[in-house]
Amino acid sequence: MSIEQQALSGLKWTGSARLIGQVLSWAVTLIVVRLLAPADYGIVAVSAAIISVISTVAELGLGASVVQAPALERETLARIAGLAIVLNWSLGAVVALSAPLAVVFFGDDVLRRVIQVSCLHFGLAALSIVPEALAYRTMNFKWTASIDLIAGLVASLATLLLALKGAGVWALVLGSLAGATVRSALFLGSHPVRPVFRFGGLRGHVAFGGTLATSRLAWHVVNQADVFTAARFLTPSAVGLYSVSLHLATLPMQRIMGIVNQVVFPTVARLQDDRPRLRERLLSGLRLLAFVSVPVMWGISAVAPEIVALALGPRWHDAVYPLQVASLLIPFKMASAVISTAIVGVGAATLDLRNTVVNLVVLPSAFLIGVRWGVDGLVTAWALSLVVVLALTVPRSCTRLEIALLDVARSLRDPLLAGGVMYAVVLAGRAALAGVPHVYRLATLVLVGAAVYLPLVSLLNRTIWADLRRLRSASRA
């Protein structure tokens, strides 16, 4: 099977597993949420926030270094596995011993015990970091997707059974641990690595992984900066308005890019020594991503008044402008995310960190200025600062990937032109349907948008459907 076929198979299997797992998770959550108290979810949310940040440090990007490395010896893998165990178990012990501080800050002794038990995740993760990385390195996406689905199913069922037994908050904690245990066991069983606790010769892996881990920690700050700024200067209702608007706008991106990046990273790592082929595949991927993301996200922006009215209700009318603005920028953010994943895939972790620092400087500064004009000012600052960040980071990323910026622009051009016409037609259609009920107006505008976009993008790029058929055939091979 060619690398292209493996990548397409990965998208198919990963996407299918994510969809099935998400549906099952939602179904179980709807039952469990009626059995537990809101405080139970609050305690677990605080614990999860702490564990997730420390886990980024403990993992130290070692898994990514295994996937990205051009060549690896068995002894090196064994040493990386040993280092992963030492780091995770040590930091897990530190967090567990520091858990009593949670009582001081939050005044809840249950949180202390939840954090301490949740630290078992560090021990489980340590055992599977290298085996999981090996599975992705070999691009065995069918197996990785199956493991994630099985582990998610176990976690959901364990949580449900424990909740039915009256376990309270421990249903969430132990259910998550059950899924993590199964996940680690399956990866370890399929790609066993015996750890060696000698760490010589790992400087390159530690440098790459440490840089990547630092970048991830910085992204934690960047991703929360707007909400923290809003919480400091705006009312709680305004914060809720902003966060819900951004959540709606970024939800498609989170779902799609979680799948795409999981496949893009190992694929780029495999192609890093064949730059012409990498360039061709990356530009093709950006073109197809824009073909899908532009009509979806610009469509959401165009019909934002109807979406807000039907999904959120009249009290959320002020969410229309934030949703419109944010949705317009998401296709560019998605393309940038693919490029960012690609530069890590070719080993340029330092450049990824430099790009993250640009985000860390520009975005929070813009938020502090924009928040003076409330929610609309904050989302406008988000959009304008994102344009600045892309202008500063994308050109140098393309240079590192040996891809001309003009070629990237050409790959996005046709969907953007068709999307722009679609947007204008939908806005004109809304004016013509001003007196029609929201639900009928929304359905009509969606159909009008599709009727405009699909023929126009086909006219601008006559090969797009042939490309899609070719990819579909390759994914079945």
For the regions a protein language model found, what residue spans apply to each?
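Membrane-interface junctions at transmembrane-helix termini in multi-pass inner-membrane proteins
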Residues: 4, 8, 68-73, 123-147, ...
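Hydrophobic alpha-helical transmembrane segments
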Residues: 112-119, 147-192, 204, 208, ...
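Specific pore-lining/lateral-gate transmembrane helices of multi-pass inner-membrane transport
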Residues: 68-84, 241-357, 470-473
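Interhelical loop/hinge segments that connect adjacent transmembrane helices in multipass membrane
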Residues: 1-3, 7, 142, 146, ...
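N-terminal membrane topogenesis motif
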Residues: 1-26, 67, 72-82, 111, ...
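Membrane-proximal transmembrane or re-entrant/amphipathic helices at the cytosolic face
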Residues: 395-398, 403-408, 424-477
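Transmembrane helical elements of multi-pass membrane transporters/channels
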Residues: 10-25, 172-175, 179, 183, ...
